[in-house]
């Protein structure tokens, strides 16, 4: 059975730990902080088998070097570090090109992992899909999506469209607890969305109890995430009103997404 556990890091990061019981070897996703990972490994008597990286940003990769040294000192093994080939991340020794290699089989996990090409937030951003779990870094957030630091709006829309087509029961493990702020924006865009209203209440209660709102699900995101709903008339009307666009012609999805991202950037 695959178990997935969150390690909190920095202000709002989640580092995900993947373990297939009864194995004591685990993988971690996007370890920006080595110290919290090592503390978790020691307290749970676990060994680190590998690291999965989604993109190059420091809050996702900053702990890799120290974790590599830790594994070499404690087990004399070479740590397997998987990451996007396009981004030349330090310590990655298994570079992944999702255009050439779309599946991985990792020791101790006993499951096929699909490697997905999801550029937008960064030029080479990738995601990992294992069983019913998606590890999507900073591409898809609950009720939101990542900023466009290196990629284009067209790339990000394509990436989000790809993720939205995953099975509805897919659990979404993004890397940040941004849900409440994203929901505030989503409700500004689509104030009459009953699913949004209900989830804002639920998420507010969860955060008041210091509970994580992650994982989300693809089904939930289809219902509440404005960036997955750019074809909905309610979203289109809101964008046209915000940007004072009287043109009666329906905006295409790319234009809607581009304007929605611009709106969110200054929200």
Curated annotation (Swiss-Prot):
The keyword Zinc applies. Transmembrane segments: none annotated. Disulfide bonds: none annotated. Binds 2 Zn(2+) ions per subunit. The keyword Zinc applies. One of its GO terms (molecular function) is hydroxyacylglutathione hydrolase activity. Belongs to the metallo-beta-lactamase superfamily. Glyoxalase II family. This is Hydroxyacylglutathione hydrolase. The lineage of its organism: Bacteria, Pseudomonadati, Pseudomonadota, Gammaproteobacteria, Alteromonadales. The gene is gloB.
């Amino acid at each position: 059975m695959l178990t997935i556990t969150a390690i909190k890091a920095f202000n709002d990061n989640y580092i995900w730990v993947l373990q297939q019981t009864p194995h004591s070897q685990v993988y971690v996703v996007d370890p920006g902080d080595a110290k919290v990972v090592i503390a978790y490994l020691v307290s749970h008597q676990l060994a680190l088998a590998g690291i999965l990286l989604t993109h190059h940003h420091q809050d996702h990769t900053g702990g890799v070097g120290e974790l590599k040294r830790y594994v070499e000192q404690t087990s004399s093994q070479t740590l397997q570090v998987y990451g996007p080939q396009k981004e030349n991340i330090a310590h990655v020794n298994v570079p992944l090109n999702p255009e050439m290699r779309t599946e991985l089989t990792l020791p101790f996990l006993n499951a096929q992992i699909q490697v997905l090409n999801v550029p937008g937030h960064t030029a080479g951003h990738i995601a990992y899909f294992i069983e019913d779990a998606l590890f999507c870094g900073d591409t898809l957030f609950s009720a939101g999506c990542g900023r466009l630091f290196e990629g284009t709006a067209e790339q990000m829309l394509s990436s989000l469209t790809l993720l939205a087509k995953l099975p509805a029961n897919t659990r979404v493990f993004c890397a940040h607890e941004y849900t409440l702020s994203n929901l505030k924006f989503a409700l500004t865009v689509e104030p009459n969305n009953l699913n949004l209203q209900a989830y804002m209440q639920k998420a507010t209660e969860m955060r008041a109890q210091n509970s994580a709102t992650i994982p989300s699900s693809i089904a939930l995101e289809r219902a509440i995430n404005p960036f997955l709903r750019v074809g909905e008339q309610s979203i289109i009307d809101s964008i046209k009103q915000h940007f004072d666009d009287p043109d009666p012609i329906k905006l295409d999805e790319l234009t809607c997404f581009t304007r929605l991202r611009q709106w969110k950037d200054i929200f």
